[in-house]
Amino acid sequence: MDVPVETMDAQERLRRYQETYAYSIRYPGAFWAERAQKFSWENPNFFKTVEHNEHENFDARQGDVNIEFFKGAKTNLAYNCLDANINKGLGDKPAIIFESDEGFREEKRCETLTYLQLKDKSDKLANHFIYVCDVKPGDVVVCYLPMIPEAVVTMMACARIGAVHNVVFAGYSAEALAKRIVDSKAKVLISAAMSYRGGKAIELFKIIAEAEKICEMQGHKIEERVCHFNLPDNESHRDWPKEKAEILAAYKQRHGGNEMSPAWTDAPHGIMRPYYGHIFLIETN
C-alpha cells in the first residue's frame, strides 16, 4: 500500500522533533547557544559560555523556582525583525504583503511594505510614544486594531523602546476590552475608528468610548489614545503620527521588553512574556 506523502512528511517532522528535543535535554547549553547565534546581540560572545544551570528549577512543588535565561545577554526584538534583515541587504524586500477584507469606507486596501518601510513606520510610532504619549520602558500599550499592517507596526514600536504590547482582538466587546485594559493597567490605547470584517462595518470608536467609561468606573483611566483612520470630530484621540524624529538615545534599541499573552480561567488574565523568549519560541517552532 502506498503511504500518502503527507503522512511521510508528518513522520519525518516527528522524528526530527524527537531528535532535537533529546539533544536539547542532553546538551541544553549547546542547544540554546546554537540558536542564539542566529540573532543579533549587543554582546554576541556571551553564547560561547552558555552553560546549564545545575540549580535550575521549573517546578514550584520542588522548591523555589530558579531560572536563568542567557544571563548577561542583550538584544532587541524589533532590531532582529527589521534592522538585522535590512543590514543583510533585504531592506527593499517585502516584509508584509497585505490585502484587506473590505477596507476603510469599502475601498479594498492592498499594500506591500518593505523592511525599510516597516521600520520607518514603526520608528514614527515609537517616537510618538516617547515624545507625545510619554511612554516609558515597561508601560503597557493596548493594541485594539483590526488585522492591518499598523498592528504589526505597533508591536514593533513597542519592542523598539521596551514597552509592553497587549494585543486585543478588534471584535471584542466594550466589556472585554475594558477588562483587558484594566487588567494590564494600560497607559496608551492604539485603535482605529472603523473596522470591516466579512463585509460588515464595525464602529470601533463606539466600542472604545463605552470601554473607557467602564475603565473609569473601575478606577483606571487611559492617558493617551492614538487612532488610525481617525474621525475629523474625534478630538479625544490623536491622529496616527506622520512625522518622524530621532528616537531618544535612552530608548533606541531598548534591550529586553515584554508582551502580554492571554490566559484563560474563569476570566481572562494577561501573562507577561519576555521578548527574549518570544524570538526563540518563533525560531524553534
What are these regions (language model features)?
Residues 1-19:
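Short, contiguous pre-domain boundary segments
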Residues 22-48, 72-99:
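A short N-terminal helical cap/helix-turn-helix that marks the beginning
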Residues 24, 82-86, 118, 122, ...:
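Adenylate-forming
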Residues 44-74:
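Active-site diphosphate/adenylate-binding microenvironment
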Residues 78, 92, 96-156, 173-178, ...:
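Conserved AMP-binding/adenylate-forming core of the ANL superfamily
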Residues 87, 130, 134, 182, ...:
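Residue-level signal for alpha-helix termini/capping positions
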Residues 90-91, 134-138, 217-226:
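Short helix-terminating capping/connector loops at secondary-structure junctions
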Residues 160-256, 279:
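Structural core segment of the AMP-binding/adenylate-forming
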